[in-house]
């Protein structure tokens, strides 16, 4: 679950991280009033779950309250990566002497949180990792002990030679770690961490991604979800208990099991196609899941072909076949469908599909190739 910048900053503030004052506005008049209240130059920042807000025109410097109103008028209602901006953060504009990056991710190999720190802040850390990896220090944290003071100081001195700044940075890293753990994050970052002309550190921007598996035990964090800033298809899928991530391709994928779903997407790319989504119907033998999956995928106008890839274990292939038949009878497909299934009750599934005008294959490679071919032709058989 993604948090907005203002939500992430509030969690950081509670943990003790120094944050510029700011408030949320949903109208230009509110933005102007907040700027007057802050009494200094401000930044007006679009609050949507999308990167590249600045490049899209969603982050503006405003020297006066009148400018804040003007920029908020332009930003509110604008679309950034298919998401409509409904609120802006009006925050004090920081004087910047230098910028650094401090972040924490989860390393799935070591099963530990890992700090990433770099003096090259203010830009995407992925870009730094690709072009100048020596500028990044990685530091895993043993969760039995947490981030120890000497570890934090080591990272602080990696960023700053000045002892005062290194100590400030070390303290902020410990506070960031506290926020990361208490909110159930998979990602938490401050970018940039700014040195002001007064030689003080302040977190100008913050990002947090919450592990969905943590939400049941953290209802106060789950309450921060903003479905209006999520893709409608992902909200629909979550309500239908489907694991779904929307992508930009044209091959709609319906698969059971996360591993097979990722392998299917890899094969689609291998054969020259682009997957339109990641969709895992899970191990349930519930035809309704297939009905919901088809409904969600067919709502995407970019999808030119639908690919089913089912390996029947716990999932019975005849239930999947019945789901396909039920869904297509209720809403006839406007794009071709390619079905690959094998495993539990395979013969019965093939019979059900054949009786209803569908053909299916047990070979994954040929099915994926056919789906890519059809999608490339724009859905024409």
Swiss-Prot record:
Its EC number is 6.2.1.5. Gene3D superfamilies: ATP-grasp fold, A domain, ATP-grasp fold, B domain, Succinyl-CoA synthetase domains. SUPFAM superfamilies: Glutathione synthetase ATP-binding domain-like, Succinyl-CoA synthetase domains. Binds 1 Mg(2+) ion per subunit. The keyword Metal-binding applies. GO terms for biological process: succinyl-CoA metabolic process; tricarboxylic acid cycle. Pfam families: ATP-grasp_2 (PF08442), Ligase_CoA (PF00549). GO terms for cellular component: cytosol; succinate-CoA ligase complex. Coiled coil: none annotated. ATP binds at residues 45, 52-54, 94, 99. It catalyses: succinate + ATP + CoA = succinyl-CoA + ADP + phosphate; GTP + succinate + CoA = succinyl-CoA + GDP + phosphate. Residues 9-236 form the ATP-grasp domain. Signal peptide: none annotated. Its cofactor is Mg(2+). GO terms for molecular function: ATP binding; magnesium ion binding; succinate-CoA ligase (ADP-forming) activity; succinate-CoA ligase (GDP-forming) activity. Substrate binds at residues 256, 313-315. Mg(2+) binds at residues 191, 205. NCBIfam families: PRK00696.1, sucCoAbeta. Belongs to the succinate/malate CoA ligase beta subunit family. PANTHER family: SUCCINATE--COA LIGASE [GDP-FORMING] SUBUNIT BETA, MITOCHONDRIAL, SUCCINYL-COA SYNTHETASE BETA CHAIN. Heterotetramer of two alpha and two beta subunits. This is Succinate--CoA ligase [ADP-forming] subunit beta. It comes from Gemmatimonas aurantiaca (strain DSM 14586 / JCM 11422 / NBRC 100505 / T-27). The lineage of its organism: Bacteria, Pseudomonadati, Gemmatimonadota, Gemmatimonadia, Gemmatimonadales.
